[in-house]
Each structure stands twice: as C-alpha cells, then as structure tokens.
Amino acid sequence: MSLSIIFMGTPEFSVPTLRSLIDAGHKIRAVYTQPPRPGGRRGLDLQKSPVHQAAELLGLPVFTPVNFKDQEERQRFRELDADVAVVVAYGLLLPEAILTGTRLGCYNGHASLLPRWRGAAPIQRAIMAGDKKTGMMVMKMDKGLDTGPVALTREVEIGGTMTAGELHDKLMQAGAKAMAEAMNKLEYNELPLTEQPAEGVVYAAKIDKGETRIDFSKPAADVHNHIRGLSPFPGAWFEMEIAGKPERVKVLGSELAEGERAVGEVLSDDLAIACGSGAVRLTKLQKAGGKPMAAADFLRGTPVAAGTILALGPV
C-alpha cells in the first residue's frame, strides 16, 4: 500500500521532501508550485521554481495556479482524488476548499518548534533572536497561520556561529525525513495529533529591507545574531567610505570578539568592531557587485585602519 499525494511547494527547501515521499513508495498524483517568474540578467526570461524543475525531471504533472479563487481550479484539485496533500513552503494561501479537498486533509512541514515562530521567516528569526534550538514540525493544516495540530517534531540544535543558510540546509534534510516518516505512519492510521499550546506564540514576520542594516550600538551578541540570521540572504550591511564614496558592504560572517571602545570603532587590523557592549569580528564580507570574500582578502583591497569609526546603523 501507499498514499496518493498532491505535493505543494516552491523553493529548493521543498525539493528533498518531494523526493523523500517518492523514495518511501508513495504515489505523487500532481505537483503544485508557484508560476514561473521573470528572471535572467534583464528579467526577460521566465524561470521555473526549483520544485517545478524537479517535478519535470521526475515526470510528474505540474500545476501553477496564481491562486485558488477560481472554482475550476478547486474542482481540478478535488478531481485528483488524492489521499492527502503535503505542503512545504508553497507560498500561497490555501482556502478551506483546498484544505478539505483530499481524503485526509493537508499536512505542512514548518521550520520551527511551534507555536514559536509562526509565519514567513522562522529560520532567520530563530537565529536573530539567539535561539539555541529549532526544528521541523509536521502539522495538519487548518484555516489559521501555522496553528494546526502537530503530528511529528524533529529538533535541531543551532550552533553559535551557524548562519541562516546553514540552518536552512540542515532543516531541509530533517524536514524531508520527518515528512516521509509522518506519511508512512498516516498510511496506517498511526499518526496522532497534538494541539499546539496557547502559550509561547511568537510570529516570524517576513524580513524587511529596512531592518537589514547593522546597528553597532547594540550589544555584540545581538549584532552577531543579526549578521548570521541574515546570511547569506538578504545580508546584513553597514556603510563605509571606499575610494572617497560611501558604499554598502554586506557582512556574511562574524564572531564575538573582545574590546570596549566607541561604538562602531575598528579595534584591530582584523576587523574587530566595538559595539554597544563587547565587540564583533567581521569574518566574511561582500562589496556591492562583488563576490563574498574572507576578511583578510577584503582588507587587502580595502584597508581599514584601527581607530576608524564605521557608520553606526539606523538613525
């Protein structure tokens, strides 16, 4: 036996789960993903999502509705006659007609330990908040925002220097295994559900460009968490003068350092920067239009003398 599944996902994060369900022996009736988006150097080429590309390689039918407001779109979903829908970072709101459009409902893979970090950016927010652990949860979806009962949890430790990109990859693999395990249990009616607690609800708002600038007036631990929580995308940044002009420099890696000076002052020739309390050492940087590079390589092309005061951050 196996389950017949409608898979719904869009980014690279979703692809291992799709493959894991197939490897577990389940039948994928169809794949739903977001429509192709303009891409390429001039934005003239339509680029299919990573899930779309993977589904085509696997020989699976792909649907790309803009939304599910159309009755014909809802009817097509129901007529697939699937046992269950699996949703991983799909990116579209699902109406009640879709949530109830399969025999067993919709199950979502969410990258946090719910109810902490409900919403769009749980990976980044967990690191930015200094959390020591997070995880992947499989939950049965309801009409709320990540409010459904939990079926399975897999915790993941967050290392002190781990970036959002590194945590993304770790959770991506953990989530693939967790969803396959959950569907195997669901097939035999062995997947109990537990309601989320009412306490501890925190929302993971989408990252806004306005919050990406580094504020060195904050404690060093907060600055360090800010940098690694936004690495590699969209990237935390500060402004400095290069060749007589102010330029943004992204910081993609950092570590805690020692030292107390004026806020934003460069303490040493290895880019240790004084913060509101303590200091951070910038270890990986990227100039506008350039490639990421180690601090030593950055400094060879752009010397920064000890005693230099960098822009402090938001004003």
Swiss-Prot record:
Gene3D superfamilies: 3.40.50.12230. PROSITE patterns: GART. SUPFAM superfamilies: FMT C-terminal domain-like, Formyltransferase. It catalyses: L-methionyl-tRNA(fMet) + (6R)-10-formyltetrahydrofolate = N-formyl-L-methionyl-tRNA(fMet) + (6S)-5,6,7,8-tetrahydrofolate + H(+). The keyword Iron does not apply. Attaches a formyl group to the free amino group of methionyl-tRNA(fMet). The formyl group appears to play a dual role in the initiator identity of N-formylmethionyl-tRNA by promoting its recognition by IF2 and preventing the misappropriation of this tRNA by the elongation apparatus. This is Methionyl-tRNA formyltransferase. The gene is fmt.
